[in-house]
Amino acid sequence: MHKKRNHKRHILIILLTFILIGVAGVFITINREQIIDEWDWLTIKSEQKMDVPIENQLPEYPNGCEVTALSMLLNYYHVDVTKRTLARNIKHVPSFEGGKYMGNPHKGFVGYMTIANAGWCVYNEPLYDVAHKYTNRIRNYTGHSFIQVMKLVSDGHPIMIISTLKFKRVNDMQTWDTHQGKVKVTPSSHACVITGYNKKKLIVYVNNPYGKKNQAVSWKDLEASFNQQGKQALYMK
């Protein structure tokens, strides 16, 4: 009888141990990103500003902010490519497919870059694919938090992100039905290259594809737009 009680006690202890390990695992998973973010905030430099060459998407590409931003990023690292080459070689998809579905910016640029009001946007995957044709140093950093993005900027890496025209959260997000499923899109979608920041002032510097070099924007507003647009980012290793 005594042996049976001990056996049951051992089983109970083992079960409790597994439960505690499981709870701890969930806690660690939930808080891992927060811990990384807090560490990155503590360790980034007080300020940074890089001399990334500025380009203007106009007049050739009224809807070509993404390839223009990507061209700026690649040219900073002396990759011999132009926005025209990128625009020509990135995958394109029609705005409407089969009369029922919208084009998917995760698959290619939706519409026309060269015709005002006839094009939409393109997301990280086609941008990565076209950049990879010219350099194997390109990295897709999509899904990382904004502070992790800024840690790379602190370390001397300009980063291209998908934001919005005014670099702040918008209220005109749409949900498109595409062949691959539902996709969030805004007519205010806009790309830029983060070139630096001032940590104390909570200012981020961006190269705006409308020809504005090191434009100062609100850190919090840019972060909000970055999150709303799916945390899409590319940089060079």
Tell where the protein language model's regions lie, with residue ranges.
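Noncatalytic regulatory segments and standalone regulatory/sensor domains
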Residues: 173-181, 185-186, 193-237
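Envelope-exposed proteins and targeting segments
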Residues: 61, 157, 188-190, 202
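Predominantly the structural core of cysteine protease catalytic domains
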Residues: 102-188, 197, 235-236
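Structured segments of extracytoplasmic/periplasmic soluble domains
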Residues: 68-80, 89-96, 130-137, 151-155, ...
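Active-site-adjacent structural segments surrounding the nucleophilic cysteine of cysteine proteases
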Residues: 2-3, 7-125, 165, 172-176, ...
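Extracytoplasmic/secreted proteins, especially bacterial periplasmic and envelope-associated proteins
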Residues: 60, 64, 68-72, 85, ...
